[in-house]
Curated annotation (Swiss-Prot):
The name this protein goes by in its record: Ferredoxin--NADP reductase
Keywords assigned: FAD, Flavoprotein, NADP, Oxidoreductase
Catalytic function, reaction form: 2 reduced [2Fe-2S]-[ferredoxin] + NADP(+) + H(+) = 2 oxidized [2Fe-2S]-[ferredoxin] + NADPH
Entries under SUPFAM superfamilies matching the protein: FAD/NAD(P)-binding domain
Organism classification: Bacteria, Pseudomonadati, Pseudomonadota, Betaproteobacteria, Burkholderiales
Pfam families given in the database record: Pyr_redox_2
Provenance organism: Methylibium petroleiphilum (strain ATCC BAA-1232 / LMG 22953 / PM1)
EC number in record: 1.18.1.2
Cofactor binding note of this UniProt entry: Binds 1 FAD per subunit.
Residues noted as binding FAD in the record, renumbered to the chain: 51, 59, 64, 104, 139, 308, 349
Cofactor(s) the protein needs: FAD
Family: Belongs to the ferredoxin--NADP reductase type 2 family.
Uppermost EC category: oxidoreductase
Subunit text: Homodimer.
GO MF annotation: an example: flavin adenine dinucleotide binding
Amino acid sequence: MDPQINPAITATANSHDGPIETDAVIVGAGPVGLFQVFELGLLEIKAHIIDSLAYPGGQCIELYPDKPIYDIPAVPVCTGKELTDNLLKQIEPFGATFHLGQEVTLVNKRDDGRFDLETSKGTRFITKTIFIAGGVGSFQPRLLKVDGLDQFDGSQLHYRVRNPSAFAGKNLVIVGGGDSALDWTLNFVQDGPNKAESVILVHRRDGFKAAPASVAKMKELCDAYEMQFIVGQVTGFEATEGQLRSVKVTGGDGVTRVVPLDMLLVFFGLSPKLGPIAEWGLNIERKQVVVDTEKFETNVPGIFAVGDINVYPGKKKLILSGFHEAALAAFGAAPYIFPEKRIHLQYTTTSPKLHKVLGVETPVFD
């Protein structure tokens, strides 16, 4: 399931002694963080990437590696894993170094304008610029609060689907009313390698915060007796011999029903946690970092924020928007890296210089 990262990348990350001096540090290895490497690389700016996960890809890999994504330009459909793998391949020419499984714990500005940065594993950097591309920060799933249920977390209680095949042939209860709950419900009901034995969807009300087409399809499957939908909330459970056997679902009518299961999947969304980012002296609005829209720079010169972590008038949380932000942020950062150099806009279609950077031959047209 993990993305196809070159083992030499992580080996390089482990070979440093003392502070690492670099042009740029990118905090977050999701799609926007990875594309930030590409845009910086075109300007010959070297970058190191830090992520709290043990693998690149961010939410795409952690939350929906197998879900289809339809809004990437010129790519009619791809999964989160495919998008991550393609981005990793795209940035290979730039030799970015990954520092995975660690979080940034300290950022201080030096007298010379650069930044001291340290991670939870003690990795230290001296960098000219910082790019925060950490999605919604360090995100955690919102938990189903039923006393004692957490003992089954990771065995029969799941807040993420890492391996869909593990649920094939099982009796599933899925709790939630958003896109993730509906998408996985449809995935496990319909014919395919991951088809479950049975699926019961539980939501506290009859309304959903999901795509109308998904809701309509779910109701169609219920009418065909291929699955069941129950309006109610999980208020308890039954277990024997250390195994979760059923959940108790209390409906709006006050009646509690016992629902047998093999696996319980809960999709209540994410609880964003900015963590140490909140202590960097940045302007923060509703747990998002305020930026300008010229360079996507924060109120601290030299620190940029791209992707879902930032906020500005008209902000849309789309991967496409993050790619655009990464391009402008790279140009905005260039004067910090090359203060005496004038940066010219070049095109990968025609620039021999960029072709050399990318390691490709310049085409010759008749």
